[in-house]
Amino acid sequence: MVDSVYRTRSLGVAAEGLPDQYADGEAARVWQLYIGDTRSRTAEYKAWLLGLLRQHGCQRVLDVACGTGVDSIMLVEEGFSVTSVDASDKMLKYALKERWNRRHEPAFDKWVIEEANWMTLDKDVPKSPMGGFDAVICQGNSFAHLPDCRGDQSEHRLALKNITSMVRSGGLLVIDHRNYDHILSTGCAPPGKNIYYKSDLIKDITTSVLTVNNKAHMVTLDYTVQVPGTGHRGSPGLSKFRLSYYPHCLASFTELLQTAFGGNGQHSVLGDFKPYKPGQAYIPCYFIHVLRKTD
């Protein structure tokens, strides 16, 4: 494992199988504070996602990286039928708590939440009776949490195969990743605010790139987050944790997605929710892939 050469995660985080980088509980707690609730989502992101789903007539949505449930909650509140899964039980507990607290609301009583692994997603999540979900979403740089342990991206291909198998014919896959092209060429993330969250708790993010045999193998982000009420006499304290990501570049990830769809899909790429053109002046923080299954 790469942990023998370079510490990829905060101490206490699981290292076997599909890694749960939030398994120590502390990272999950601080992350929940950072991302906040649905009110912390940017208006641009909310309008874009809801508009996209409604434009394509999507009703049944599978969130394959729901984390604390912030996107799923937003979709449930907006009238979508949502199934939410994540590999981290420490993250899921926040979603489960929200469902319990709002169980008297019919939409939340019907909200399905399961622990699931991308490597066995086809077995963990029953496929919709309609042949799949209208839309499958994997947002917030979530897919990059999956490392390339074997060095051949076979885990990535299997995970994408399983994820795309959940999409019905005519349905959508919405999946994103950070602009790792820029990170690898400059050593730091593009400037600008997070396009997903309005949080003001982040004090610093330090970027590191791990290279193995002259190939970028991993990007780590060391977060320093201001946590209210944890310092001296109730003042804000600082919490630090590290998350590691596989650096998916735009061209190679596009190829992985097209292979997963077997060439049967309409594929568009956006940079920070706007149509992206290679060489454009604006450098996006995130690339968002929208694929429609046409088989």
UniProtKB/Swiss-Prot annotation:
Reactions it catalyzes: glycine + S-adenosyl-L-methionine = sarcosine + S-adenosyl-L-homocysteine + H(+)
UniProt activity-regulation remark: Inhibited by 5-methyltetrahydrofolate monoglutamate and by 5-methyltetrahydrofolate pentaglutamate, inhibition is much more effective by the pentaglutamate form than by the monoglutamate form. Two molecules of 5-methyltetrahydrofolate are bound per tetramer. The binding sites are localized between subunits. Inhibitor binding may preclude movements of the polypeptide chain that are necessary for enzyme activity.
Alphabetically ordered keywords of this record: Cytoplasm, Folate-binding, Methyltransferase, Phosphoprotein, S-adenosyl-L-methionine, Transferase
Residues at which (6S)-5-methyl-5,6,7,8-tetrahydrofolate 1 binds: S4, Y6, R242
Binding site for (6S)-5-methyl-5,6,7,8-tetrahydrofolate 2: Y6, H217, R242
MF terms in GO: folic acid binding; glycine binding; glycine N-methyltransferase activity; identical protein binding; S-adenosyl-L-methionine binding
Residues where N6-succinyllysine is found: K46, K193, K198, K203
Matches recorded under SUPFAM superfamilies: S-adenosyl-L-methionine-dependent methyltransferases
Pfam families hit by this protein: Methyltransf_31
Record family assignment: Belongs to the class I-like SAM-binding methyltransferase superfamily. Glycine N-methyltransferase family.
Protein name, entry field: Glycine N-methyltransferase
Organism: Sus scrofa (Pig)
Gene name in the database record: GNMT
